[in-house]
Design a protein with these regions (language model features):
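Conserved active-site and cofactor/substrate-binding residues in soluble primary-metabolism enzymes
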Residues: 1, 15, 19-22, 26, ...
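Adenosine-phosphate binding glycine-rich loop
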Residues: 2-23, 218, 331-445
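Flexible, glycine/charged-enriched surface loops at secondary-structure junctions
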Residues: 21, 37-44, 117, 154-163, ...
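Glycine/serine-rich phosphate-binding loop and adjoining beta1-alpha1 elements at the start
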Residues: 94, 113-227
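Rossmann-like adenosine-cofactor binding region
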Residues: 262-363, 368
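Structured beta-strand/loop patches that form or line metal/cofactor-binding pockets in enzymes
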Residues: 40-71
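Glycine-rich phosphate/diphosphate-binding loop of Rossmann-like nucleotide-binding domains
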Residues: 191-194, 199-311
């Protein structure tokens, strides 16, 4: 496979879509040698089909603000790949949303979902609408307008959206209510729902919980115990909250969280009421972490910087894509970090990843580490289909088993001759093989 030529052709077809092209290139680097061993894949143009979404739905979303003025946003749903199940992936409401970001997320989601072993294809959607600064009534009207178009493209056996950045339980509730109103159908068409109407226990914290289960497996395989380790976390939303909660439960000490305004360093550890306060910060809608240092005087707020300059044992990006760059990676390496686990999607830049792998560090990508969120969404789908509700202990046990299985697949496909586990290659190859076999079995569709 000529990766450079393939990427040139793809970029000519999709100019300017940097996030999407970055995600494709990263996977190609991992699977090129395996692809070359299967001439039947090349004859079937498997790769050319795999990197293109099956369907992209774009639509306008008109809604009325509290002043009576009509606002118009753009809505998207990228139905990327359904080879192993109905499209599954979140909805993101944020001003930065564009087609490149959603295509990258849908592409990554395809392999992430394959790693869970659950029957879920890959998809992603959202809008350039930001809930920040909007009233509940405005958010409700936007969600209702968004679903008025989206409903005709989704269903429990077709496409099952969930939440993501800017889409929490409130937004999922408004979206589900409008879907039910339009279709007169009460089904598991969305995940991340409230418990009162079909949600699953553990779902809000599942991405963070699953990430820590995976990181613990990484450390244990390398002869380390997570207990007593210091942890840097970025972000302060559901993912960061879940990660901080589970890290503390496992005996680690979380010392940072962050927001758009900077980061908090708390040498005493972020636990107990401090973790609860993260929820208050998020609920305030201000999208800042500085008030944490006022609430807990022992902590320090560092304005305009990322937490990767802090000396820690474990670094967990939990905020957004490309939040940890090459310079940040060098800071972590110089400070002797043991392990980096992406809990955000594509949280590290290619330069950062190259540095981690060159130093033979414990590093694992988001498609493996953060798969706990979509895995628990899959468990929510199962509960909805059976009209059952499992206990928190049962869901957590299943989540733990799934993350153990993902780690095992990464080790199986990513172990190099010297014993180093390249988790990037392992995750990409394991996910790709399952999707590739399914696509070949289903013909040219």
């Amino acid at each position: 496979m000529n990766i450079e030529l393939f990427m040139q052709q793809l970029e000519a077809r999709h100019p300017g879509e940097k996030e999407y092209l970055q995600a494709v290139h990263e996977v190609l680097l991992s699977i090129a040698d395996i692809y070359d061993q299967h001439p039947e894949w090349e004859r079937a143009s498997l790769l050319e089909r795999l990197v293109e979404p099956e369907r992209i739905i774009t639509f306008r979303v008109p809604w009325v603000d509290d002043k009576g003025k009509v606002q118009v946003n753009i809505g998207y749903r990228v139905q990327f790949n359904s080879a192993i199940g109905p499209y599954k992936g979140g909805l993101r409401f944020h001003a930065s949303v564009n087609l490149s970001i959603l295509k990258f997320l849908g592409f990554e989601q395809t392999f992430k979902n394959a790693l869970t072993t659950l029957p879920m294809g890959g998809g992603k959607g959202g809008s350039d609408f930001s809930p920040r600064g909007k009233s509940d009534a405005e958010i409700m009207r936007f969600c209702q307008s968004f679903m008025t178009e989206l409903y005709r493209h989704i269903g429990p056996e077709v496409d099952v959206p969930a939440g993501d950045i800017g889409v929490g339980a409130r937004e999922i509730g408004y979206l589900f209510g409008q879907y039910k109103r339009l279709t007169r159908d009460f089904s598991g068409v969305l995940t991340g729902k409230n418990l009162e109407f079909g949600g699953s226990l553990i779902r809000p914290e599942a991405t963070g919980f699953g990430g820590l289960y995976f990181v613990r497996e990484m450390l244990e395989r390398a002869g380390h115990d997570i207990k007593g380790k210091t942890v840097a976390i970025s972000g302060f939303g559901n993912v960061a909250w879940g990660a901080a909660t589970k890290a503390t439960q496992l005996g680690a000490k979380v010392v940072t969280i962050s927001g758009p305004d900077g980061y908090i360093y708390d040498p005493d550890g972020i636990s107990g009421e401090k973790i609860d306060y993260m929820l208050e910060l998020r609920a305030s809608g201000n999208d800042i972490v500085a008030p944490y240092a006022e609430e807990f005087p022992g902590a320090q707020f560092v304005e305009g910087k990322h937490p990767w300059e802090v000396k820690v044992d474990v670094a967990l990006p939990c905020a957004t894509q490309n939040e940890l760059d090459g310079n940040d990676a060098q800071h972590l390496i110089d400070n002797g970090v043991l392990c980096v686990g992406e809990i955000s999607n594509m949280g590290c830049t290619p330069e950062a990843i190259d540095k981690f792998i060159a130093h033979k560090m414990l590093y694992a990508p988001g498609k493996a580490v953060n798969a706990g969120g979509v895995a628990t969404s899959g468990l929510e789908m199962s509960q909805n289909a059976m009209h059952l509700s499992w206990s928190a202990e049962d869901v957590d046990k299943r989540l733990h088993q799934i993350m153990h299985g993902i780690h095992r697949q990464c080790v199986e496909h990513g172990t190099e001759a010297d014993g180093y586990v390249n988790y990037v290659r392992g995750a990409n190859v394991a996910g790709f093989m399952k999707v590739a076999k399914a696509m070949m079995a289903q013909g040219v569709v």
